[in-house]
Amino acid sequence: MPRSMADLSFRRAQWEQRYAPHVAPVNCWVDELRNPYGRGWLPDVAPLHGGVEARALSVLRDPGPATQDGIGSGFLCTENDDPTAELMAGLMDEVGLAPVDLLPWNAYPWYINQAPNADQLDAGVEAVLHLLALAPDVEVVLLQGGDADHGWRRLLRRHPAIERERGLTVIRTFHPSRQALWTRDPAEREARSARRREAFAEVAAALR
């Protein structure tokens, strides 16, 4: 059910399982990336998701406030208690995607709560490459929003053959936040919303 992280028992269960075998390689690596003297803190990946067994990698911009440890859940999760996660959970449910199908991530995985700059996107490229190495079953990359797309294009400059070599299907759409629909043109708003639904349907079709 959407926003399950608002439930303390659900959140506690996710915390207790954060080093379950399917997510341990990712979350142990996340532990290594946390550095108060470097780029700072980043959230774990919730064990609700597929971890290294996931077939789809979802990339957003950067971790939002609902991921913060102590304030939010401490996890990247489509069950976080915020509108963006709620929309993603709904879109997944509409097309038959399960949480285990997905590995959630960000173009810049450290918490900044603002648009990443060029240096940060470059750092994010290295993180995405390492994540793909950890998750060999990923077949689809879902880029949600302009920053996710920009980060992927920077990745392709370094590794132009990765899509072909890994057999990746790359799907682009708008960010699942409310702000992504901000426009005075009602037709454009509806087109953006429709594209988000289409993109999730494309992910589901690619995984069949």
Give residue ranges: language-model regions.
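A polyampholytic, Gly/Pro-enriched intrinsically disordered region
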Residues: 187-208
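A polyanion-binding, active-site-adjacent surface
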Residues: 2-159, 168-174, 178-181
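Short, surface-exposed amphipathic charged segments that create phosphate/polyanion-binding patches used
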Residues: 119-122, 182-194
